[in-house]
Structure formats: C-alpha cells, structure tokens
Amino acid sequence: MTINKRAGRSVKKNISFYIISIILTAITSMIIVAAVSTGRTLTKVVRDFVDEYKAEDAEFVTYKPLTNDDIEKLENEYDVILEYSGYKDVKVESGDLDGATIRVFAKPEKLNLYDVRDGHEPGDGETLLTQDFADAHNIKVGDEISLGDHSYKVSAYTTKADYIYMLQTFTGFIDNEKFAVMIVDRQEYDKIDAEETAYYSIKYNKDNSKEVRKRLNKDYVIASYMAATTNTRISMPVNEGDAVSNMATMFAPVMFIIVLTLIVMVLGRNIKSEQYLLGTFISLGFSRKQIVGHYVRYGLMPGVIGSVIGVLTSIPLTGLLCTFYIEYDFETLIYKPTYNIPSIITALVLPTLLYCAAIAIQAGRLLKKAPVDLLRNTGKETKTIGIMKDSHAKTQIKMRVRSVIGHPGRSIVTI
C-alpha cells in the first residue's frame, strides 16, 4: 500500500462529501465575488456619471429672484457653480402617449447636464428623450412624437444627471410608461404653453455650503432648499452601490465562515476516524511531514476546484446583477461590469488555505500520540458528558440533550 493509492481510495470513498464541499465552496466564492463586484460597479458607474455630467449638490427656491449679475457675483465670491433651472410638465391627452406626463427641460449649460446616445443634439423641432420611456412605447431615434400642440422628432436618447432615478415626484414610484424627460433647445422650450416650475441649482467647489446658504437666506430669503443627499432622484442610485457593497461585506463573510467551518469540521472528523492509518504510515517509515502533506491534499481538491469554479461563475452572475440593478432600477446608463480583484484573490486563496491549515493542524495533533495508540485506535480522546447525570428524565431525553449541549461547537454551526 502506498500513501498515494490510499489518498485516491479515500477520495472515492467520500466522493459525495467532496462533491458537496466543491459545490458549497463554489457557491460561497461566487456570491462573494459577484456581490462585491456588483456593488463596486454600481458605485463607479453612477458616481462617474454624476461627476462627468455635473449633478447639482443642492437645489433651492428663493422669494427674491436672482439676476444674472447676482449669480455671477455669488459664483466668484464663493467659488460655486450656480444656474437657474426650470421645467414644464406637459400632460398628453391624446394619441399614442395619452395619459403620459412629459417633463420638458431647456438644454442646461452648467449643471445637471445630459448624455446624447444614438443620435445628435436637438435642433429646431427636435428633442432628446429618456430611453426607458421610449422603449416602453417603442419609440426609435428619428420617430416623431406628439405632445398635443407640439410635435418633435427624437434626435437621440438621453439620461439627465439629476434624473438617473426617474421619479415624477419624490414620494412616487418609477413608471416608465407614464413619465419621461425631454430636453429641447431654448427656443423650443419657450414655445411650450405650460406653467414653469423654477428653481436654482448649485454645486460647491469647496466645503462652504453653510456660508453660502446663510448669504442666500439673508439677501434673497430661501423658500426651500434640498441637498442632493435628500434628493431621491440623485441619492438613490448613488447610495445603492454602497448598499450592495455593504450587504456583501456583511453577509458574504458570514456565509463564507459557516461553509468553511462545516467543511473543516467534517474533514477533521474524517482524519480522526482514520487515526489508525497514521500509525500505519509511521510504521511503514513515512515521516510526519509526508503524512501531514498526504492529508493536506484532501483539502486541496474542494478548495482549489470549488474556488476556481466559483470565481468563473461569478463573471456572468456579476453581469446579471449589474443588469438587474442598473437597467431595471435606473434610467439607461452605459456601463461595463468591473471585477473586484481583492475579493477574487480572497475567494481563490482563502478556502484552500483554511482547509489545508485545519487538516494539517488536526493531523499534527494526532501525530503527537504514540504510534501504538494510533494503531490500536486508542489515541482518540474521550470525555464523559455528565449533563443531567442525576436527572430522573427518560434516557432518550438525556441523550438528546447531551448530543446538543455536549457538542457546543457542532450545535452552533448547525444552527
């Protein structure tokens, strides 16, 4: 009998355990990598878009209007970007878009900018349209849409920096069939006969928001002020990536530890049940290092194979999760999934390392015993569980209680 042949027979004997171990390891590694990578992708995609297209830090309304000179003076004095903003809600009451509300913006110049996809900037009689609404109504670039008194040719699709999360009202919900954003040039905007909702958008280049607000309230009297952190259209997508990452860092390690502990416990028990073989190996002249190395191989298979499978399957899973969050929760954004390297390294290395370390420690402890005790299988430590020793309860009840309380580690992991 060679030590290598014995390893092969042991794996065949416990093949179901190794298959389950590989599956559990793969699932755990897959979830860790996919969840962390999805969170990082969401955060990067949204923050990059918000930064590139200059989403506001706050919006406010004042009782006294700001003139262009006032805006320029405040920008120079406080190092801020300030812009008058406004929109007109057009309720469509006929045609294919009957019942929809279209929020029309004039093209912004400084803040809350927009991207242009699959087309060009709007000119006379043209408009940009948010893509989720367009997809819901099968509207293509080049098609013409009617808003009652006015018709526009869709020149391109767009996403506006302050409307990534497409809410008509802050307390409402997303309805891609009934609400959309359009962006037209100033001349087309002025032609629309609808009430304008006006406000000011501001972006701070340094940490002086309190000082600026104090000045605004003193000179113009602030009627309302809403920071971007409380603006659901901006804060929801910005925070969702962090929320996914936080959930991944909280729950994935717990699952990881539970699965690893279960597998390590079973591997350790398998070695204990075969301790007579350790005595045989010693008698055959194998060194302790060779014996430990032999048993370490038992941890390599589920660790390496499971981790590799888990990391490979995490690639398509990350793509699916990104699609779920970005394409179903947010207005259309151009993105490419990014994979978190530290989580990949952890998923590849940690399971194998822990499996092998646990087995090596267990084998090392057993090898400290006398070879004769190992051969006779008397090297196994036993202890008497004295729980309910003097109780008059039925023996069956005593045994059940002792099986739980007498093995606290196993019971905790099972729970």
Where are these regions (language model features)?
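Membrane transport/envelope proteins' first extracytoplasmic loop
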Residues: M1-L260, R269, Y328
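Interfacial "coupling" helices/loops that link adjacent transmembrane helices in transporter permeases
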Residues: R9-S10, N14, T261-M301
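Juxtamembrane/interface segments at transmembrane-helix termini
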Residues: G39, T43-R47, I359-V372
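Short coil/turn motifs that cap or connect alpha-helices
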Residues: K140, S287-R288, A370
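Conserved G/P- and acidic residue-centered "switch" motifs that form tight phosphate/ATP-binding loops
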Residues: G142, G285, G310
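Short cytosolic juxtamembrane segments of multi-pass membrane proteins
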Residues: M1, L367-I385
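Small-residue-rich transmembrane alpha-helices
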Residues: V264-R269, E274-Y276, L300-L333, I341-K368
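N-terminal Sec/SRP start-transfer signal
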Residues: M1-M30, V296, K383-I415
